[in-house]
């Protein structure tokens, strides 16, 4: 159906920065935002203390505000897919509609960390962070809704009892608590006529991702699970990316690795599917990309030619038992295999 809606947005931002005694920085920032009938004032304070030339400590705390988008409020969309019912799986239409009663999402954020300069060309960072959400906006999962609310009027069945449609919408999750650790290491070497080498590795570890259980209301840690029975995606505990770049003159070579840790799948597995090799675990994933860029200059033009091989070893996405699809987790992994990209960039 056609929808005609509008709203006004106003915002005001201020920031104050002060250096104390040469080695201590304090910054205060604030933002006032009014979107439609909702408004919020969100302050943030951050500190940075240089213990010496090598070691820096940092911390921050603040709040944030996110109004629902116009699509989340009013849009409608029909998708065709597979639905896991309470006892069987069906092809069905998923009717996704907006929710005009959504509240803005708010959060309190904080972090504490350090920067350690090992020497002039290398540094290590480590940060612990936490986010406490209120009214975080989520989209109902059609399969989860059909399984947990089999008798709901939003589950449309034909005369034979098979699911032919599911109405889903956006909703405010009352509370979510997320915390984790980010770390990175980077270094740089100049080999003169042999070129330069830059290496960086960065990782994230989720410690907790707590959301309410639909039945009991108690907070459940979703880290390390496929979360088939919740209106949310999988949360692998670790994600680690590394970047190695060699550069000489007009040539650059990049080598990238992307690691995602495995996670458990509590979806009940039938004995027949277990016999086919399906398990209650989604395996780790490691993908490797490589790319080469060559720079050219012709008159007043600069040109960059590039070739990139994504997932150069053609690794398959880890197998997931998710009847009726029996394939992979599209929210985490890419099943397209090896991709070759050619690019031309012209600057003038």
Description of each model-found segment:
Residues 2-48, 107, 256-258:
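Surface-exposed extracellular loop regions of Gram-negative outer-membrane beta-barrel proteins
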Residues 1-27, 215-241:
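Outer-membrane beta-barrel transmembrane domain signature of Gram-negative proteins
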Residues 64-127, 131-132, 158-181, 186-190, ...:
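Outer-membrane beta-barrel signature, preferentially recognizing the C-terminal barrel domain
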Residues 207-208, 258-271, 292-348:
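C-terminal beta-signal and adjacent terminal beta-strands/loops
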Residues 30-36, 61-67, 76, 110, ...:
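Transmembrane beta-strands of outer-membrane beta-barrel pores
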Residues 23-26, 53-57, 120-124, 192-197, ...:
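Repeated loop/turn-to-beta-strand initiation elements of outer-membrane beta-barrel proteins
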Residues 14-18, 47-50, 63, 116-118, ...:
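Residue-level signature of outer-membrane beta-barrel architecture
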Residues 10-16, 41-47, 98, 108-114, ...:
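Hydrophobic, lipid-facing positions within transmembrane beta-strands of outer-membrane proteins
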């Amino acid at each position: 159906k056609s929808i005609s809606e509008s709203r006004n947005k106003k915002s005001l931002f201020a920031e104050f920065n002060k250096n104390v005694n040469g080695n201590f920085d304090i910054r205060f920032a604030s933002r006032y935002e009014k979107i439609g009938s909702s408004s919020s004032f969100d302050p943030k304070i951050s500190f940075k203390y240089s213990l010496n030339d090598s070691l820096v400590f940092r911390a921050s705390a603040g709040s944030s505000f996110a109004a629902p988008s116009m699509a989340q409020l009013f849009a409608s969309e029909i998708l065709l897919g597979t639905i896991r019912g309470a006892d069987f799986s069906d092809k069905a239409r998923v009717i996704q509609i907006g929710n005009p009663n959504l509240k803005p999402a708010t959060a309190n954020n904080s972090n504490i960390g350090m920067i350690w300069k090992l020497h002039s060309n290398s540094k290590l960072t480590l940060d612990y962070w936490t986010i406490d959400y209120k009214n975080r906006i989520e989209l109902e999962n059609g399969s989860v809704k059909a399984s947990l609310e089999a008798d709901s009027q939003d589950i449309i069945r034909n005369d034979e009892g098979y699911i032919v449609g599911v109405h889903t919408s956006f909703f405010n999750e009352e509370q979510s608590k997320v915390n984790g650790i980010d770390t990175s290491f980077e270094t740089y070497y100049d080999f003169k006529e042999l070129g330069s080498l830059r290496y960086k590795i960065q990782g994230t570890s989720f410690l907790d991702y707590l959301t309410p259980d639909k039945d009991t209301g108690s907070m459940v840690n979703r880290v390390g699970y496929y979360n088939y029975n919740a209106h949310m995606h999988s949360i692998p505990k670790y994600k680690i990316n590394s970047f190695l770049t060699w550069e000489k003159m007009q040539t650059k070579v990049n080598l990238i690795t992307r690691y995602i840790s495995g996670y458990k799948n509590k979806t009940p597995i039938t004995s027949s599917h277990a016999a086919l090799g399906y398990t209650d675990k989604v395996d780790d994933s490691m993908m490797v990309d490589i790319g080469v860029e060559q720079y050219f200059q012709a008159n007043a033009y600069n040109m960059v030619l590039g070739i990139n091989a994504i997932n150069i070893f053609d690794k398959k996405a880890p197998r997931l038992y998710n009847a009726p699809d029996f394939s992979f987790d599209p929210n985490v992994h890419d099943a397209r295999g090896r991709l070759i990209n050619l690019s031309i960039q012209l600057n003038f």
